[in-house]
């Protein structure tokens, strides 16, 4: 697994803009492996000094976010990452969580994150909400 993360570091470190490559690889890896392997891979890759690899790991965390411990890690740890690109992926991963459990069921978590003292945690929700306003649930329930 360490070798795989090192190969991701070599591959992703040259990417300066966007996140599509990281997102595509994370989705492929998620679909190709069991959740325990992906969980270990996500935590290992999040330790990387290469922010693009941390972005990849945050996409993986998004796919695993039904797990309360993963969701708490996103809220409490990933939100402290100093790289703004990782923060953008945090917003996408929060959206993924809401999509997985359903936007209506996600409302208590949305409220919880909006009350968080960390501005990046709140930002993850509000960035996503700009996109979510087009989702059927939010169109039907604008309040």
Protein language model regions, located:
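Alpha-helical scaffold domains
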Residues: 1-143
